[in-house]
């Protein structure tokens, strides 16, 4: 499973816009992460992992 698929699964019923705001990225950046078109910076990976109470490794590797 790609990290984009994992992010979509973790997002659940929330909109991309809602999650993007909660994590502190733009909606377009979040959409690109889900489509595997862009890889988040390490700092953003950590914020995403913390938001979902997961490790960076669980989501991105």
Label each PLM-derived region with a short phrase.
Residues 31-32, 41, 60-61:
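Key DNA-contacting residues within the recognition helix of helix-turn-helix
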Residues 26-29, 41, 55:
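Short coil turns linking two alpha-helices in DNA-binding domains
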Residues 43-58:
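DNA major-groove recognition helix of helix-turn-helix/homeodomain DNA-binding modules
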Residues 1-13:
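A short, Lys/Arg-rich alpha-helix, primarily the initiator
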Residues 7, 16, 45:
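Generic structural marker for isolated residues within well-ordered, non-membrane alpha-helices
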Residues 13-15, 40-43:
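Residue-level signal for the short linker/turn that defines the boundary of a DNA-recognition helix
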Residues 13-32:
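Short alpha-helical DNA-recognition segment
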């Amino acid at each position: 499973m790609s990290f984009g698929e994992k992010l979509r699964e973790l997002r659940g019923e929330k909109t991309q816009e809602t999650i993007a705001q909660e994590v502190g990225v733009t909606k377009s950046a979040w959409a690109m992460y889900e489509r595997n078109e862009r890889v988040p910076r390490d700092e953003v990976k950590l914020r995403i992992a913390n938001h979902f109470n997961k490790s960076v490794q669980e989501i991105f590797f």
